Regions:
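Loop/turn positions that initiate beta-strands
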Residues: 49, 79-84, 227-230
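N-terminal signal peptide c-region/cleavage motif recognized by signal peptidases
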Residues: 20-22
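Intrinsically disordered, low-complexity Ser/Thr-rich linker and spacer segments
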Residues: 30-34, 88-102, 241-244
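Bacterial N-terminal signal peptides that target proteins for export
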Residues: 1-12
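Gly/Pro-biased beta-strand-loop elements
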Residues: 90-198, 219-222, 250-251, 256-320
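Primarily a LysM-type cell-wall glycan-binding module
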Residues: 27-60
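LysM (lysin motif) carbohydrate-binding repeats in extracellular/periplasmic proteins that recognize
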Residues: 47-76, 118
């Protein structure tokens, strides 16, 4: 039987365990070519009044990734002194390390400043069921501080039908859903922006736009110029290499039509493997561990291979 605790135990070992102090923005030096993993899993102790929403905001985390990394812990009352895992180790997304990269399945953005050997990463609120965020390649076409909000017709109609009508314009200020800053994307109708709500970052809550913590969106505003490329995709299964070992990071696949079946998830893993043959070739995979990681969906990289010099995994070895 799969035990999610076994995966966490491998990750939160003495080599990786850091007791978090004051939170800082999540940024990491880029690893050298051929390396894909950044950060380390951290652990903090909850205070009496803490909730996962509080802890997530203080540590640049999203709500659902906190829940996934801490199975069995009450997110509204973790308990004073309870050890809380912060899943701050990441496999960098596949593809070019440039501009803004958003992985919807992670509820997370990665930003690679041009000419710098660093990556910043931020949690996101994304489009809820029926209002999914787009999968596309686009760019930032405008930057607007202290924006007013002009609700589109579809949102006005939705709120009116719910008996909660909106004004045609919401001025800048603490009640503005866009927060202190917005980026307009080349994909019509979509924004990256702040928020007037404490809750919702790292969840499916928006009408398709990308919500950030206000401190995060203001930090990004100082760095990302108009013209910055934005690549948006949804990949729940990321493979990457670190120190000669192959790792897999698994998240819950997004599906507007219900929970994906086990077969769907395994098919997605095989697709991710084929899409990453340039890094997975040369490794013999431990399929027992892969099954654990896929079932666990805890969002933390786990080692899934035994390195070999001449034997590559083939579909004949796959136990699905």
């Amino acid at each position: 039987m799969f035990c999610r605790a076994s995966v966490v135990a491998r990750l939160v070992s003495p080599a990786f365990l850091l007791i978090a102090g004051q939170a800082a923005a999540l940024s990491f030096p880029l690893p050298p070519p051929g390396e894909d993993v950044v950060g380390e899993v951290r652990v903090i102790q909850a205070k009496y009044e803490d909730t996962f929403a509080d802890i997530a905001k203080a540590n640049d985390m999203g709500y659902l990734e906190m829940v996934a990394a801490n199975p069995g812990v009450d997110p509204w009352l973790p308990g004073e002194g309870r050890n809380i895992v912060l899943p701050t180790r990441y496999i960098l997304p596949p593809g070019p390390r440039e501009g803004i990269v958003i992985n919807l399945a992670e509820y997370r953005m990665y930003y690679y400043p041009k000419g710098e050997n660093v990556v910043y990463t931020y949690p996101l609120g994304i489009g809820r069921e029926g209002w999914g965020s787009p999968v596309t390649n686009t760019s930032i076409i405008d930057k607007i501080p202290n924006p007013a909000w002009y609700p589109p017709k579809s949102i006005l109609e939705e709120h009116a039908a719910e008996g909660n009508p909106l004004p045609k314009v919401v001025p800048p200020g603490p009640d503005n859903p866009l927060g202190p800053f917005k980026f307009r994307l080349g994909t019509p109708g979509y924004l990256i922006h702040g928020s007037n709500k404490k809750f919702g970052i790292g969840m499916r809550v928006s009408h398709g736009c990308f919500r950030m913590l206000n401190d995060n969106v203001l930090e990004l505003a100082k760095m990302a110029p108009v013209g910055t490329k934005v690549r948006i995709f949804s990949e729940p299964y990321k493979f990457g290499v670190s120190q000669g070992q192959l790792f897999l990071e698994a998240h819950t696949p997004l599906d507007d039509h219900g929970e994906p079946s086990v077969v769907d998830k395994h098919t997605a893993v095989l697709t991710a493997l084929h899409n990453n043959e340039q890094i997975t070739a040369g490794y013999q995979l431990d399929w027992n561990v892969i099954r654990e990681v896929v079932a666990g969906e805890d969002g933390m990289p786990a080692e899934v291979s035994v390195p070999v010099s001449s034997v590559a995994s083939t579909e004949a070895e796959m136990p699905f």
